[in-house]
Amino acid sequence: MYLCAAKKKEKIMKAVFISFYKAFYAEMIEELDKLEIRGFTFWEEVQGRGNETGEPHYGTHAWPTLNSALIAMIPDEKVDALLEAVRKLDATAPQQGIRAFVLPVEKMS
């Protein structure tokens, strides 16, 4: 949890990790901007495959596409809106397997 120094008020934060097809970078940034989520860390090329459906993204001759990933530490109250935005984006290209995972943030400095 993040403690606001001035008021000692707890602010619950979550880490949201999102893996998505590289071609959706602009759309992901647009969704973050809409929700006023400014800070994130971005990995341009990551490999992987979904556990149920979707195509592998290995960057090879057989599976040439690659994913990107980002992680953002956001207030708990923005999590549901971000997950809904990810669901909507995933629905536009279900074979690409855009996924978001939410983790607790214990401490920040």
Roles of regions detected by a PLM:
Residues 2-109:
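Positively charged, small/polar-rich N-terminal and surface patches that mediate targeting and assembly
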